[in-house]
């Protein structure tokens, strides 16, 4: 039987996958060839949920998703559902690349 935290985490993974146009990874990335919790064509998302007001982000969590995303030719994203608010954490270089892409697209319109 799943705990309340597991149920909430799966609910948020499903929500994020739908919003990003991706799919939730079976077994939350436990298989060697399908890492991350949510996969899109561009992003590999590791998702963390807590009903608490704080959450510690350890370097090991970030390093894990970065390494898995690089091996999968995707951008790493850490999705966090914290105290009823949702956040996505990306590498600074990826954020700058996304901003430049948006600028270029706007110029073509």
Residue ranges and their predicted role:
Residues 1-109:
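Catalytic phosphate/metal-binding cores of nucleic-acid and nucleotide-processing enzymes, i.e., regions
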